[in-house]
Amino acid sequence: MIQKRVESGIISLVIVFLLMFLAIVLKYYNITEDKKDIPAAYQRSVVEITADVGQGTIYDRNMIPLVNTEKYQYAAIVPSAVDKNEIMRYAADKADFSDNYESGEPFVFKCTDVPPESEGVTVFEIPERYNGYQLAQHIVGYISDGTGVSGLEYAYDKVLRGNSGENKVTYYADGFGRVLIGDGKTVQRSSVYESGIVTTLDSRIQKICEKYGSSIDKGAIVCADVETGDILALASFPGYSYNEIDAALEDERSPLINRALYSYGVGSIFKLVTACEGISEGNDGYLYSCTGETEIDGQQFRCHKYDGHGLQDMMQAMTESCNTYFISLSRSFDIVKYRDLAASLGFGRENFLCSGITGSAGVLPTVDELAVPAELANFSFGQGKLTATPLQITQLACTIAGD
């Protein structure tokens, strides 16, 4: 009897100890689980609302911006902290605002007017990268998804993006990412737009070139400083819309091409080079009687004045742009020196402006090719195989006019 009571007591004691151990285990489990829940419910994190990642500005020579020229107001809001109808009246696109507001997530919208700032509303003044009409677009180029694709935007992409700065507002949030209104906010406003790169372009001259060149179906205008050679304006036609890049890619007129950097037949302006070589070889007093045509190895070459210009010196022949005069003048030239002069004036050589913007070398006939009399005759007044870019021709004009 006593033994049974002892055994029963031992069993009861074991059960008590087991229950106590189980209670301790459960308590530990609850404590550890509670600790896991604490970050999710109470631990603070941050939520950033970025209105814009700015990029440096491209300026003309007078520090007039070619991009970032117009500024607009944008507002970053926390839907849970603002009245929808009160703020929506400031939105440029109310339908888009409504959709974003209903999502409950913080967002940024463009404003038609400046809303009052509050804990849940932060206003930023942000420049538009490109406006409706972009000046010097073939030099400026364009960006896609924040990265430079062509022009200076491509060439100096790292510089312009390296100068980037964010316009953003930062809030504290709970572990679920919900903004904690009332805990304050941190606002960062970027001044990066004032930094960037400076070009040699003069926006005033560029505007004039683009205005009067807009009627050109296909072509280019280049304007340079005679003394320094600085490019003051460079315009290519036709232009394109930044909002319709895909359409421009499909356009048979190829508006994305910078025609100032593509090579074409040169024509009579090359007579300047022929005249320079004539002077260099001591033939500045050369006289020739133009009859309207001349024959070289059985091939007829005509002057634009079919009945001829008569007897002319170099100045008169240049004034009249007489083809046969320069054909005759060139026949006495040292061909190697003649070609070398053309090369020294930029023909047959690429124009490297910056990474991604390089003018074509064009075609400068070889000495062997110019040894053929008919080829030399064509070369003397800018015909035949010779090609050059509008930029190369501008350089030629600057070299001569500068002297």
Language-model features: locations:
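Periplasmic/cell-envelope proteins involved in peptidoglycan metabolism and beta-lactam response
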Residues: 1-245, 286, 339-344
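Beta-lactam-recognizing serine transpeptidase/beta-lactamase-like catalytic domain environment
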Residues: 65-67, 225-268, 273-403
